[in-house]
From Swiss-Prot:
Protein name in the entry: Homoserine O-acetyltransferase
Domain AB hydrolase-1: 38-359
Pfam family name, one: Abhydrolase_1
Source species of the chain: Haloarcula marismortui (strain ATCC 43049 / DSM 3752 / JCM 8966 / VKM B-1809) (Halobacterium marismortui)
UniProt keyword Transferase, yes or no: yes
Length: 402
């Protein structure tokens, strides 16, 4: 598989908020050969990188394993022998593209929280500018999951004539109030860490706000799993004898078991703090929280009115972060805009992470849609009843009552 890993300067960049920086650099990876009309843009999720494929590469974005290697590659759903696949790290992140930890050329110091606020619109416009640099005027498809799915929707809204097909997976037109609340709590875990220092913690003698970022990531992990998957994987088991608590406890607390689920959360949070920047977590979650498809329009359908391509909306039954009902509402808006749309619902108890861990269920409809649009053999169109009831949230009440 032909793989290109590069960083491109887009020069001065004006953000959605009106602020500018002298230079925006975007790191990207590209796979396959471009033939003029086979380009597929993949939009990564919140803490993802441009390293979407190539399991054996260890020099990309400090991630040993590509985040969607089961989907992108030769003979896979997004077949790099058929398509030229581009994935770009978004502005505000910390995997090569310019963000808070990058050096401000005007001061010689990292931006920190002097970096401009970032929105999903900024991600889309930076991707459009990158594709211009690469000589790609038009896309066969844009594909992405979670907030990457919001990025996909924004492409249909802002550049409807530049893309033939869109695939928002495990996404919605906006976050609901519960998820907004949880993201706010996660950010406060970071900003109340004494090492955060108003976002300026990059000095040689500074320690990053790792405890706050670890807590934020632990909350995120719970959001991405379902009640059933957590029960199946961890239950109430105590951790093994060799497990070590990451966070200190008091003498009375030591009487009680250190559970397997706590050990899992601690381990993954510690690994996350080794590779991700706390300020980037603040910036990217705010971009996700702020996203509203209808912004500037009367409705979601109005926002999508200019898009006349094909759309495959994919959702998962146990995803309480972006529910099947929210996905159906997005599909309805696309139908109202006269787009060709199918809402493909996958029965899964993996929660929000299902789009990353179920390639056998995600791959076939995605591959068929890229090839044949909504008429693809493996593509189904489900009608999801609107309901106020939910059994998706693993901690729906307790987070607010303890």
């Amino acid at each position: 598989m032909n793989v290109e890993h590069n960083t491109v300067s887009l020069g001065e960049f004006e953000f959605d908020c009106g602020e500018t920086i002298p230079e925006l650099e975007i790191t990207y990876e590209a796979y396959g050969e471009f033939d003029g009309d086979n380009a597929v843009l993949v939009c990564h999720a919140l803490t993802g990188s441009a390293h979407v494929a190539g399991r054996d590469r260890v020099d990309s974005a400090d991630q040993a394993r590509a985040w969607w290697d089961d989907i992108v590659g030769p003979g896979k759903a997004i077949d790099t022998t058929e398509y030229y696949v581009v994935c770009a790290n978004v502005p505000g992140s910390c995997y090569g593209s310019t963000g808070p930890k990058s050096e401000n050329p005007e001061t010689g110091e990292p931006y920190g929280t002097d970096f401009p606020p970032v929105t999903v619109t900024d991600w889309t416009e930076a991707q459009r500018a990158l594709l211009d640099e690469l000589g790609i005027p038009h896309l066969h498809a844009v594909v992405g999951g979670s907030v990457g799915g919001m990025n996909v929707i924004e492409w249909a809204k802002r550049h409807p004539d530049h893309v033939d097909r869109i695939v928002p997976i495990a996404a919605a037109a906006r976050l609901d109030t519960q998820c907004l609340s949880l993201d706010a709590i996660a950010r406060r875990a970071i900003t109340t860490d004494p090492n955060w220092k108003q976002g300026h913690y990059y000095g040689e003698d500074d320690e990053p706000p790792s405890d706050g970022l670890a807590l934020a990531r632990q909350l995120g992990h719970v959001m991405y799993l379902s009640k059933a998957s957590m029960e199946r994987r961890f239950g109430r088991r105590a951790a093994g004898r060799d497990a070590v608590r990451t966070f200190p406890t008091d003498a009375a607390g030591a009487f009680f078991p250190y559970r397997d689920v706590e050990s899992y959360l601690d381990y993954n949070a510690e690994k996350f703090t080794e590779r991700f920047d706390a300020n980037s977590y603040l910036y990217l979650t705010r971009a996700m929280d702020n996203y509203d498809l209808a912004a500037g329009f009367e409705s979601d359908a109005d926002a999508l009115a200019a898009f006349d391509g094909d759309a495959l909306v994919m959702s998962f039954t146990a995803d309480w972060h972006f529910t099947t009902q929210q996905a159906e509402a997005l599909a309805d808006s696309l139908r109202a805009a006269d787009a060709n749309v199918a809402h493909h619902v996958i029965d899964s108890d993996h929660g929000h992470d299902a789009f990353l861990v179920e390639p056998d269920n995600v791959g076939p409809p995605l591959a068929d849609f890229l090839d044949a649009g909504v008429d693809g053999n493996a593509v189904t169109d489900s009608v999801v009843e609107d309901s106020q009831e939910s059994n998706f949230a693993p901690v729906h009440n307790s987070l607010f009552s303890q």
